[in-house]
Swiss-Prot record:
It comes from Arabidopsis thaliana. It is an enzyme of class 3 (hydrolase). Residues 788-812 form a coiled coil. This is Dynamin-2B. The gene is DRP2B. Ubiquitous. Preferentially expressed in siliques. PROSITE patterns: G_DYNAMIN_1 (PS00410), G_DYNAMIN_2 (PS51718), GED (PS51388), PH_DOMAIN (PS50003).
Length: 920
């Protein structure tokens, strides 16, 4: 009975869980309306099989009419509930939530009268009774009319038997046990429960078949699981069926009359069925069998229900998190909620801004795309046109004529051009401001708490937008100040370098002029020496001796003359379909050691890049130079060698340095590097031919990509005659002014590049970082300045939201309770089932294998032989053929079973103490 009580609690929990999973109101009144079929017991049998007597035995009171005049003519449903405080004789009838104490005889006569009145008609109205006693298990008993009556059809049976959890009680009288295979009740049970997982067989009226050996043999075969194949998977229980009536008739006011009757019933059954398992005899065995079947059915449903509850719990928690906490009905609570919502909004804002969600990537896109493009599109060509530069310089009030010192005009030009950078900077600030405003709107929409209070959401967006406007104004002031800073102060060193470079140009021109005149003098002296030297007439001539003496004294000059007479060949290699790739060795000056390293250089004219490797066989460049923003100029060997150590000079010798083999590659933008971290790349060719070819090709690439070439290298590429003409020309004022404008443009471009790098930093500082740090403070200060009435008007919760929150809170509480209860019941039910299966191995229909049809017929033949053969089924002459496997020393698990259901591999707890705990 205790097991039934636990199953009743489990059934109630499962009913509430089903209501929750069906999204019904978790209130007990509404969930109780959902029918629970796990504790339903449907009695199936023919007229006179003893169905009502068996149900009376379960109730503990003769409530249902029995006998010929009490045949069931309509379905009778008795909903039982157990109350231990009642006496064993008390019966409480519940009608419309009202309790009325009645007697068993009064209920029986009332039911008999109703059945008699309805016998004339063909009505199928059910009779429903709700009883509360201390003797009955909490089950719902359904007594159907006899299956052989005309009023019984498939729809009436299916209405109650089709539920997956309803227990089917197949009632067969002992006198018809030998004909069990043809029982209609068994066929119907097999139709609705093919695996017999919710079927219990009852053999009633054992006392009436005590004198029929054949019937007793068939009963013992069924109880010993040796019946026909269709009965071996059904647990069978034997009952007398009249124990309750006998106890009621013989009761003399004792509370133990029912227990006495049930013990008497068990003793009578033991004396009649001497070879049957004792665990299958009597009313107590019936209750245990019902509990086992109900537990098995519930165990199948529990995992799915628990899984559904876990998923439902997650859904409920997500909804509660989305709906938020309940609003506190006070001024302080309302203000606290407002500040907490500001905190939630700020978290979402930072997530969108710093985490890259939403439109955060547009800030970086503005810095890397739109703003640099606007800087590059500034009309520098128009401002640095020679005519415009000349006009500005002429209009400026310089200290000296502009050809000598046009400093003031050039300063004015620099300020005018840098003024153009203010508009792109302001546009960059406006773009970032629009992005931040979009992020504010997206963050407000993504904040769950603000969604519940639309007026407060609009207020938060307005406060945040006003704060962003202030940050935007500060950022505009900052970027304009950056531009004005560059405009206001042009370093004097820039103009000093202009003069220095002009003087350097003049010095180089003088050097080139001196070199050309020296070459002419050397050529004239060589011709004079050849003309004055005598021809060698013989070996003893004086001229010959003088020539030989000169050859001995000047062997090196002779070798040099031979080298001059032999034309040099370039060592560079070309490749590609159009010869666009040039490769060869160059000496690269190291910045660390100040020494020269021989490297393999490769120039790609299509890509405009110069790369080098340590060896010719290497495939990956150690460094590359982009020639687009570079300039090339020739430097003297003295400048290239001045950083060499004296040790290197001694090792190379006095004549190791070649004449004019060094040139330098630099970047037109002062703060940029050419190669790795170096601002200049100093190279030295192996010969003058290689140098000229390298310089010509590098100049070609640089000029094709908009670069500029140093003046020295340009003059070096000209012929000597044209160079002399250029040196002898007077200074061209326009050429000088053009050169100065180019220098000033280089400075302006460097400043613009610097602004392109620094303006985004100012924008990030004044707008992005400022909004990260001060957004919450702005919200807090603005909300704190609002009055209580204004805040309460802004934070008004929707009533629908409030009702939904209350509903989900109830569901959450009930879900946690049901999950805990069902988990405990699942473990207990599994443990109890495992213990029951282990302890009842001898009598369990699923542990013993089903007997064949031949064994079934032998049992009838032995019963028909006479009393001597029947003794073999008693306790003294127990037959080994039909005896229990445990008594034969056989392993019950090894017998050939038909459909054995294994129990879970879980260790059960210690079994409960049996004895007086079964009061009923």
């Amino acid at each position: 009975m205790e097991a039934i009580d636990e199953l009743s609690q489990l059934s109630d929990s499962m009913r509430q869980a089903a209501s929750l999973l069906a999204d019904e109101d978790p209130d007990e009144t509404s969930s109780s309306r959902r029918p629970a079929t796990s504790l339903n017991v449907v009695a199936l049998g023919n007229v006179g099989a003893g169905k009502s007597a068996v149900l009376n035995s379960l109730i503990g009171h003769p409530v249902l009419p029995t006998g010929e005049n009490g045949a069931t003519r309509a379905p009778i449903i008795i909903d039982l509930s157990r109350e231990e405080s009642l006496s064993s004789k008390a019966i409480i009838l519940q009608i419309d939530n009202k309790n009325q104490q009645v007697s068993a005889s009064a209920l029986r006569h009332s039911l008999q009268d109703r059945l008699s009145k309805g016998a004339s008609g063909r009505g199928r109205d059910e009779i429903y009774l709700k009883l509360r006693t201390s003797t009955a298990p909490p089950l719902k008993l359904i007594d159907l009319p006899g299956l052989d009556q005309r009023i019984v059809d498939d729809s009436m049976i299916g209405e109650h038997a089709q539920h997956n959890d309803a227990i089917l009680l197949v009632v067969v009288p002992a006198s018809q046990a030998s004909e069990i295979s043809s029982s209609r009740a068994l066929k119907i049970a097999k139709e609705y429960d093919p695996e017999s997982t919710r079927t219990v067989g009852i053999i009633s009226k054992i006392d009436q078949a005590a004198e029929n050996p054949k019937s007793l043999a068939a009963v013992q075969a069924l109880l010993s699981n040796q019946g026909p194949p269709k009965t071996t998977d059904i647990p069978w229980v034997a009952l007398i069926g009249q124990s309750v009536s006998i106890a009621s008739a013989q009761s003399g006011g004792s509370e133990n009359s029912l227990e006495t009757a049930w013990r008497a019933e068990s003793e009578s059954l033991k004396s009649i069925l001497t070879g049957a398992p004792q665990s299958k005899l009597g009313r107590i065995a019936l209750v245990d069998t019902l509990a086992s079947q109900i537990r098995s059915r519930m165990k199948l449903r529990l995992p799915n229900i628990l899984t559904g509850l876990q998923g439902k719990s997650q859904i409920v928690q997500d909804e509660l998190a989305r709906l938020g906490e309940q609003l506190v009905s006070s001024a302080e609570g309302t203000r606290a909620i407002a500040l907490e919502l500001c905190r939630e909004f700020e978290d979402k804002f930072l997530l969108h801004l710093a985490g890259g969600e939403g439109s955060g990537w547009k800030v970086v896109a503005s810095f890397e795309g739109n703003f640099p493009n606007r800087i590059k599109k500034l009309p520098l060509d128009r401002h640095f046109d020679l005519n415009n530069v000349k006009r500005i310089v002429l209009e400026a009030d310089g200290y000296q004529p502009y050809l000598i010192s046009p400093e003031k005009g050039l300063r004015s030009l620099i300020k005018t051009v840098l003024e153009l950078a203010k508009d792109p900077a302001r546009l960059c600030v406006d773009e970032v401001h629009r992005v931040l405003v979009d992020i504010v709107s997206a963050s407000a929409n993504a904040t769950p708490g603000l969604g519940r209070y639309p007026p407060f959401k609009r207020e938060v967006v307005a406060i945040a937008s006003a704060a962003l406007d202030g940050f935007k104004n500060e950022a505009k002031k900052m970027v304009v100040a950056l531009v004005d800073m560059e405009r206001a102060f042009v370093p004097p060193q820039h103009f000093i370098r202009l003069v220095q470079r002009r003087m350097e140009r003049q010095r180089r021109e003088e050097e080139l002029k001196g070199r050309s005149s020296k070459k002419g003098q050397d050529a004239e002296q060589s011709l004079l020496n050849r003309a004055t030297s005598p021809q060698p007439d013989g070996p003893s001539s004086t001229g010959g001796s003088l020539k030989s003496l000169r050859d001995k004294l000047m062997p090196q000059d002779k070798d040099k003359d031979k080298e001059k007479e032999t034309p040099e060949v370039s060592g560079l290699k070309t490749a590609g379909p159009e010869g666009e790739i040039t490769a060869g060795y160059l000496m690269k000056k190291s910045a660390k050691t100040n020494g020269w390293s021989r490297r393999w250089f490769v120039l790609n004219e299509k890509t405009g890049k110069l790369g080098y490797t340590k060896k010719q066989e290497e495939r990956n460049f150690r460094g590359t130079v982009t020639l687009e923003e570079c300039s090339i100029e020739e430097i003297s060997d003295d400048e290239g060698e001045k950083s060499k150590s004296s040790k290197d000079k001694k090792s190379n010798g006095p004549d190791s340095k070649g004449p004019g083999l060094v040139f330098k590659i630099t970047c037109r933008v002062p703060y940029k590097t050419v190669l790795k971290a170096h601002n200049a790349l100093v190279l030295k060719a192996e010969s003058m031919v290689d140098k000229n070819e390298w310089i010509n090709k590098l100049q070609k690439v640089i000029q094709a990509r908009g670069g500029q070439v140093g003046s020295a290298s340009m003059r070096q590429s000209l012929s000597e005659g044209s160079l002399d003409k250029m040196v002898r020309k007077p200074v061209d004022p326009e050429e000088e002014l053009r050169w100065m404008s180019q220098e000033v443009r280089g400075y302006v471009e460097a400043v613009l590049n610097s602004l392109a790098a620094n303006v985004p930093k100012a924008v990030v500082l004044c707008q992005v970082e400022k909004s990260k740090e001060d957004m919450l403070n702005q919200l807090y200060s603005s909300i704190s300045a609002i009055g209580n009435e204004r805040i309460e008007s802004l934070i008004q919760e929707d009533q629908n939201v409030k009702r939904r929150r209350d509903r989900y809170q109830k569901q959450s509480s009930l879900l946690s309770k049901l999950t805990r209860q069902l988990s405990i019941h699942d473990n207990r039910a599994a443990a109890a089932s495992s213990w029951s299966d282990n302890s009842g191995t001898e009598s369990s229909p699923r542990t013993n294998g089903g007997s064949s049809g031949e064994d079934w017929m032998n049992a009838f033949n032995a019963a028909a032989s006479g009393p001597d053969s029947l003794k073999r089924y008693g306790s003294g002459g127990h037959s080994r053929r039909y005896s229990d496997p445990a008594q034969n020393g056989e392993d019950s698990s090894g017998s050939g079973g038909s459909s054995r259901r294994t129990t879970p591999n879980r260790l059960p707890p210690a079994p409960p103490q049996s004895g007086s705990s079964y009061r009923y």
